[in-house]
């Protein structure tokens, strides 16, 4: 017989463990836990596992079922009551602590409030920036580089087709020739005249003796009139209550059911008319709705119809009519210098040709001293002798003289 190798599972361990029950309580006599779970090759399907080689887990905890409980160790047993009586103060302390605790739904809120009270200072606040706030708002599905536009479109804007691309089969004059030909040959002279309107029907078409004309008297007699007579004040019976006047009796309105609005009337009302209606705005707009996203070219593309670099609109300039000089020279053909050299006269006679054009009335004839024009202005401290002399001229007369002071508040001297 081959000896068993080390680590092989025991083959008769299931038969050696005693049973704690009689019969089959759950319809099966096999054990609830399979010890061979440690060895995958020996594991049975749909069986529970347990900690192997442990009598505490395998016997006391795993074999639980009807008839296996000890009725003596209940909550009313002496052993259980002695344990509870011994720790009465600790239970009272624990109960007091539990009453001070908030409900488990509000524990997170209370903890957050306590942190706000104790943690106050720089760096302890969670202030959200504008980027985080913008991320919470409904935004566009596009990314930073996706414009939502077709990558390759047809030529637009500054594209002009070349020769041979206009008109039918590349000839732009084909349509004009066809119109000229049809206008002069296809329509006749009478075809251009507009249709005349149909004549009106004269008469009703009824023969003599087929209709009757009612007279004015018959029409007046058949006219609907009231049933009251000349002496009838109120219509109806005399015994009925008076509906009008001072002695009238108020009519009671018939009892009617309350007029509730139907579901259709309520949905068509002014406040609920737009509910459930598709919006007219596009889901993916061409330009984003928020101005902060207008900075990037991918989210706010430029209009392709606008002329780009290399194209411009010429400015319309006003053409002014200017009389050009005969030989493109602005100078006079015969100036004053040339006239003096040719004729030899230095004082030509004529209108505007006088050299001395000063008016006699504007000449200043006042006589002045010659020394005024020969003197030069001198600065202060340039000539000390002259400065000392000039200082004496402006010296006041009362310099060095002290006038007697008179006190007008005191009594006059006798």
Curated annotation (Swiss-Prot):
Pfam families according to UniProt: SHIPPO-rpt
Signal peptide: none
The protein's name: Ciliary microtubule-associated protein 2
Species assigned in the record: Mus musculus (Mouse)
Lineage: Eukaryota, Metazoa, Chordata, Craniata, Vertebrata
Gene: Cimap2
């Amino acid at each position: 017989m081959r000896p068993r190798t080390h680590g092989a599972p025991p083959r008769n361990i299931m038969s050696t463990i005693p049973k704690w029950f009689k019969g089959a309580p759950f319809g099966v006599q096999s054990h609830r836990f399979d010890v061979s779970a440690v060895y995958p090759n020996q594991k049975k399907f749909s069986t529970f596992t347990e900690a192997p080689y442990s009598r505490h887990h395998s016997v006391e905890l795993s074999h639980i079922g009807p008839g296996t409980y000890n009725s003596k160790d209940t909550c009313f047993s002496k052993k259980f009551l002695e344990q509870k009586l011994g720790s009465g103060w600790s239970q009272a302390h624990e109960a007091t602590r539990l009453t001070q605790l908030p409900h488990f739904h509000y524990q997170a809120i209370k903890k957050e409030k306590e942190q706000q009270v104790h943690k106050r200072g720089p760096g302890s606040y969670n202030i959200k920036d504008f980027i985080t706030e913008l991320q919470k708002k409904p935004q566009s599905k596009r990314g930073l580089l996706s414009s939502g536009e077709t990558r390759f479109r047809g030529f637009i804007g500054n594209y002009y087709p070349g020769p041979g691309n206009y008109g039918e089969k590349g000839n732009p004059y084909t349509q004009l020739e066809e119109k000229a030909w049809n206008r002069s040959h296809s329509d006749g002279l009478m075809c251009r005249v507009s249709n005349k309107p149909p004549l009106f029907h004269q008469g009703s078409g009824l023969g003599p003796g087929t209709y009757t004309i009612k007279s004015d008297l018959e029409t007046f007699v058949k006219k609907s009139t009231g049933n009251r007579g000349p002496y009838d004040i109120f219509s109806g019976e005399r015994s009925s209550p008076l509906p009008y006047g001072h002695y009238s009796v108020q009519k009671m309105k018939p009892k009617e059911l309350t007029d509730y609005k139907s579901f259709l009337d309520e949905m068509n009302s002014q406040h609920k008319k737009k509910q459930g209606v598709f919006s007219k705005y596009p889901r993916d707009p061409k330009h984003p709705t928020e101005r902060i996203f207008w900075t990037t070219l991918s989210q706010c593309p430029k209009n392709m119809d606008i002329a780009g670099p290399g194209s411009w609109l010429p400015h319309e300039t006003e053409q002014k009519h200017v009389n050009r000089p005969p030989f493109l020279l602005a100078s006079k053909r015969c100036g004053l210098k040339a006239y003096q050299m040719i004729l030899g006269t230095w004082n030509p006679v004529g209108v505007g040709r006088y050299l001395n054009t000063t008016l006699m009335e504007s000449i200043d004839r006042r006589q002045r001293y010659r020394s005024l024009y020969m003197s030069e202005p001198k600065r202060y401290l340039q000539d000390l002798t002259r400065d000392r002399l000039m200082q004496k001229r402006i010296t006041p007369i009362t310099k060095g003289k002290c006038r007697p002071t008179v006190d007008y508040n005191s009594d006059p001297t006798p």
